[in-house]
């Protein structure tokens, strides 16, 4: 699967369960660890867990074996390592505190085309 397709699989999985404020960062020129980061918010720890589980399920359904995941039990910040794509699902306060978009400033950013209604 192409990396851009995997990004879209992650975005679709997040949108399926109404993730908020989905942003993709192209970090190919910034780090050798991954090519893209997808960042999204869930409105509760339960939703963060559900969103993360859905991304993992959809990745596996598309033949991608996740390399690892962290934070699924806490529901505050789930990190999913899909290889060329790393997905961060967080509570809004956690996202604001760590401000990954600022940390990776200079990386090309794009928002998901379809944002779920609130």
From Swiss-Prot:
One of its GO terms (molecular function) is ribosomal large subunit binding. It comes from the Bacteria. Keywords: Cytoplasm, Phosphoprotein, Repressor, Translation regulation. One of its GO terms (biological process) is negative regulation of ribosome biogenesis. It is found in: Cytoplasm. Belongs to the Iojap/RsfS family. The lineage of its organism: Bacteria, Pseudomonadati, Pseudomonadota, Gammaproteobacteria, Pseudomonadales. The modification Phosphotyrosine is found at residue 36. This is Ribosomal silencing factor RsfS. The keyword Cytoplasm applies. One of its GO terms (cellular component) is cytoplasm. The keyword Phosphoprotein applies. Functions as a ribosomal silencing factor. Interacts with ribosomal protein uL14 (rplN), blocking formation of intersubunit bridge B8. Prevents association of the 30S and 50S ribosomal subunits and the formation of functional ribosomes, thus repressing translation.
